[in-house]
A protein has these predicted regions:
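Replace the tail clause
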Residues: 1-151
Length: 151
């Protein structure tokens, strides 16, 4: 179930009706990921971000994609204006991983919140391919992801 309905952030409210089981950023949800040994998908943006709105319409409102994301990850939506520290930490990681950054900032992390993959806006098919490949790595070779996160 989407957990954003009671959030005060305009950005989080924009995503409250998405079929994705979004959670707001909290220590509790990070602890849940660790206890369930489930990967995190953290999506960071802000209410006036053009590409954030495009990604929501093309990807986050799509039931098929939401079903995959809900199965594969614990999904966290972050308003960068509410959590500039989280945005800064993961933007630094995205730049280290990919050489660039921007918003929406999408990060996949191990259950311990260490990032292993980052992207900004991706078209629908690229997004589906990426989350499917990440899921396969998690299923077949989680040790490779853990080694990569330690670098």
């Amino acid at each position: 179930m989407n957990q954003l309905t009671d959030e005060s952030s305009a950005y989080l409210q924009q995503h409250a009706s998405n079929p994705i089981h979004w959670h707001p950023w909290s220590k509790g949800i990070l602890n849940k990921a660790a206890s369930q040994n489930k990967w995190l998908l953290i999506s960071i943006g802000y209410s006036t971000c053009h590409w954030c709105h495009i990604m929501e319409k093309e990807i986050f409102e799509d039931r098929h994609i939401a079903d995959k994301m809900n199965e594969y990850f614990i999904n966290i939506k972050v308003d960068r204006e509410e959590h500039p520290d989280v945005d800064h930490a993961y933007m630094s990681a995205a730049i280290a991983l990919t050489g660039g950054g921007g918003w929406p900032l999408n990060i996949v992390c191990l259950p311990n919140a260490k990032p292993i993959w980052a992207s900004t806006y991706l078209p629908r098919e690229n997004w589906i391919n990426a989350i499917n490949k990440l899921h396969q790595i998690n299923i077949k070779s989680p040790d490779i992801a853990e080694d990569y996160a330690e670098k």
